[in-house]
From Swiss-Prot:
Free-text tissue specificity from the UniProt record: Expressed in stem, leaf and flower.
Pfam families given in the database record: 60KD_IMP
Mitochondrial intermembrane side: 138-142, 245-269, 331-429
Entry protein name: Mitochondrial inner membrane protein OXA1
Lineage, uppermost ranks: Eukaryota, Viridiplantae, Streptophyta, Embryophyta, Tracheophyta
Amino acid sequence: MAFRQTLSIRSRLFARRNQPVYHIIPRESDHERDSFCQETSQRSYHSFLHQRSVNNSDFSKVSGGSLHLPLAPTSGFAFYRYMSSAPGVGSEKIGVMSDIAEVITDSTLQDVPAQAAAAVSEVTLAAADSFFPIAALQQCIDMVHTFTGFEWWASIVVATILIRSSTVPLLIKQMKDTTKLALMRPRLESIREEMQNKGMDSVTMAEGQKKMKNLFKEYGVTPFTPMKGMFIQGPLFICFFLAIRNMAEKVPSFQTGGALWFTDLTTPDSLYILPVITGLTFLITVECNAQEGMEGNPMAGTVKTVCRVFALLTVPMTMSFPQAIFCYWITSNLFSLMYGLVIKRPQVKKMLRIPDLPPPPPGQQPSFDLFSALKKMKAMTQDHTQNQIEPPSPVNPRLSSTSLSPVSKRLKALESQVKGRKKNSSKKK
């Protein structure tokens, strides 16, 4: 029985030496008492081991020698805490642990959800269900807002300028191609006139199409070159519109992210100042830059008229939009205006290697429209193929009379009757 008790005690001491457990967080007032208790525990612990080693000499003989277990100084403290039965000591330490538990429960655990929510940006939560380009624009605006510390309206303005500046090389390339198309327009008109003079038969159509293809290849453009600007500006405007509208709906800080009279960016402008400014800036941009790169194109006037009408309709159409959208729209209009004014300067055109267009002759308006000419050629080609599939049937002289008008048929019938009467009268005589 004594052997089992000794073995169990020593195994527990060995485990506590390797894995010491601290169940008490001492206070400043307990330092002296803890040091006294530690010295007492070490003395009692060594005397206890000495007594056990004397009484259990048989166990040491069986094992081939005395069992030495080197223990750390903390094991005496742990042993004393488990083996001590001093009154009042454990209750005070338990009180300390209960106080710590209350502090953790009341303050720390309540702050964890708030800290976790603050770690995730409100824009990230708003853009979680958005399409990738729209979410990327929202993150771009948020990055500008985070790194610069600007208000939301200024962050939208800066993000608009950065993204529109990145599209300038594409706009310059589109302007070069449009200018090349204007330069080759007289040659296209000469090909069209040549095709009309030759009767627009199948051989002439094939030759004209071949010449046009070679001409487009020579200048490095396509018939859809004037639409490149629409392909660039259209999707960009739609993505910006959807991104800012989503942020105005789901980002709470937009309610105080404005300035002057538009402090709340989530509501429409009750004074209608921003819609009017948007329409005016767009109209000025149209008047200054609508025909840039479209010289010699008869569609330029139509495009300018449509843009004027759209500028006037902008005010009533945008009255219900959030004010955050106008921070982008007005900035984009001003950027387009400045870009058009700069790109029209001869020095800038020379530096960017944009070819100059020859001035049109006075009193003569170009009448060639590329798209209408292509449509006419396509329609004539289809008619020609249908005629080849259905060859004309030979004309029957008997059936040709059926194609005459009813009046001519009546006249011929009367002539035959008159001739018949004359023959009958001559026979009677």
